[in-house]
Every structure is written in C-alpha cells, then in structure tokens.
Amino acid sequence: MAIDENKQKALAAALGQIEKQFGKGSIMRLGEDRSMDVETISTGSLSLDIALGAGGLPMGRIVEIYGPESSGKTTLTLQVIAAAQREGKTCAFIDAEHALDPIYAKKLGVDIDNLLCSQPDTGEQALEICDALTRSGAVDVIIVDSVAALTPKAEIEGEIGDSHMGLAARMMSQAMRKLAGNLKSSNTLLIFINQIRMKIGVMFGNPETTTGGNALKFYASVRLDIRRIGSVKNGEEVVGSETRVKVVKNKVAAPFKQAEFQIMYGEGINTYGELIDLGVKHKLVEKAGAWYSYNGDKIGQGKANATIYLKEHPEVATELDKKLREMLLHNAGEFNSAASDYEDNENEEMNNEEF
C-alpha cells in the first residue's frame, strides 16, 4: 500500500513537472467514460457530417479529399469554406492548380471578399505559406488545391524530361512533420485535395493510388474518397450529379461509412433534398404516396416540390436539420488534464488532514 502511495506521488510530481515545462494539457488521462471533445466544421452535407461521426471535419487536423476528375472535390471544399465563414471563421485557399473560379465560389455561398487566396509558383512556396498562416493562429481553415500541382522547385527549374524521382514525396513528408504540431496548437483545419493515379502492373487489388507519396496518408486524420455515381436530370437536361463519399480513414470516429448526395451545377450540394431523404428515413417527415408531410402539414407533392417548400421556409429546414443532428450525432465528453486530477486528489487529502 505504501508502495502504491509512493508511486502515486512520484507520478503526480512527474506530471506536474511535464506540465510546468511544456504547458497545461501537454499530457492527458483518458477516463473510461470520457472522449476528446473535437471541434468540427460542417462539410455542407448533413449525410456526410453524419457519416464522419463527429458532425463534420475536425479542427486542428489534416484532411485529404481525393477522387477522379470532376467528382466534386473542389465543390466540397468550397462548401466547407462557406460553412466556416458563416461561423465567423477565417479561411484561406492555396490555389496551386491556378483554376479557382471566384464566380462559382460566390454561388456556393463563399464570401470571396474575405477569402484569402494564394497562387504559389512552387510546391515549397505553397507549403511555406500554409505553415506561416498556421503559425499565425489567425486562420481557421486552409485548403490546398491540389497535392498533384505542388511541383518542387527543382522540377520547375529543370527541363521537361528530367528525372526527379521522389522529390514531391520528400517535400510532402517534410511538410507533414512540420505542419502537424502547428495545426494542433493553432486549431487550424488543413484540407488537401488530391488526384488519383494508376499503379502500373497491378494484377490483383486496387490499382488506384494518390499522388505525393505516403506521408499524407499517415498524417491525415480523415481521408475522403469522392466519386460521381450518376446524373441528376430535369427532363432531358443534366442539372447535377449523384455523388458518393466514402470515409476511407477516420481517427475521430468509426471509418468506412458512406454518404450519398446530389451536387447541383451552379448551386453546390442539394442540402434540402438531403433533409427530405433523411427525414423520411428517420420518420421525421411522413411520406404518403407522392405527398410529403412535416408536423402534420403537407409540404409538397413529390420530392422536388417538398425541396422547394424547405427553400422557401428556411426556419422549417433549420428545425428539421437540428432534429436530425440531435438524433444521429453523439456529443463528445470533456477531456481533462491528468496533472489537475492528481492535484485535486492531493488538495482533498490536505483538506482532510487539516480537519
């Protein structure tokens, strides 16, 4: 028993020393019924927020979004920016592809007047800008579009046809080591958009891979695979695309969940259509034949009319969104300092001794 008490005192002293040297919260104790309270930003899609488990993309972490061309990668990140700006957060867009369309971004709800934008010349410059913005502590969301366009300086200064084996992978590996800690301390969300490449000579298994080496795969807390799986038509005219997002990796909740939603051309994610579908699935919206009803009131005949009703009555849409989030998302608990627990125990013992 005396040995246990000595161990407890030694541990309390060690924890106190660590926190004194490295700051409060530098070492934590995971209680049995506690989980880390991760702050998140909505993706703009309710079904994807639910699939992610935490209610959105986690702050202070690295996220990778990859998929084929025209699958909705940039659209999804612009929706994240719009959602973050609505919460009063500061966002930056590192446009390495030099292809950002400000008119389209504005249509998706992005406040382009307050969006920081950079079009770097080299990959090193892009990543240094990311690091500088992160260390400032004043930027909440940074988007890099895309990893494939982060060209090392040596490759740009060289000639076409020169061999530059592993340069991009080495550059990304160094950047990840430098950025990861800074992102956590400044609580900045860094999203990398990535492209797909094919491995040569793969006979079995998935031949697809992403650019930039393996470092990003390891450092990313969330990896999203986004694919276009169909078209949305209005008569004969194609007005959007059916999109599926798979959570390939998730360090803040259970992975491998999927979300399906529509991306409408010129409008972005069809959030009202998602509310109708999820409302029907979880019995918050009643469907009788072609008619949709909410709280006993008919809101439209057919999904298109029900969607229009929600568009015209945003207070109803907000109420339905809130109910679905409360039903489908779990709130995380508190995450306390280990040293403070021992300090509390010691204080209690001292108080008991006084009496």
UniProtKB/Swiss-Prot annotation:
Q: Which GO terms describe its biological process?
A: DNA recombination; DNA repair; SOS response
> Which Pfam family, any one of them, does this sequence belong to?
RecA_C
**Gene Ontology CC terms:** cytosol
Coiled-coil annotation reads: none
Stored CDD domains: RecA
Q: Which InterPro entries match?
A: AAA+_ATPase (IPR003593), DNA_recomb/repair_RecA (IPR013765), DNA_recomb/repair_RecA_CS (IPR020584), P-loop_NTPase (IPR027417), RecA-like_C (IPR049261), RecA-like_N (IPR049428), RecA_ATP-bd (IPR020588), RecA_C_sf (IPR023400)
Q: Where is the composition biased (Acidic residues)?
A: 341-355
Keyword annotations of the record: ATP-binding, Cytoplasm, DNA damage, DNA recombination, DNA repair, DNA-binding, Nucleotide-binding, SOS response
Under HAMAP family, the record lists: RecA
Biological function: Can catalyze the hydrolysis of ATP in the presence of single-stranded DNA, the ATP-dependent uptake of single-stranded DNA by duplex DNA, and the ATP-dependent hybridization of homologous single-stranded DNAs. It interacts with LexA causing its activation and leading to its autocatalytic cleavage.
Q: What is this protein called?
A: Protein RecA
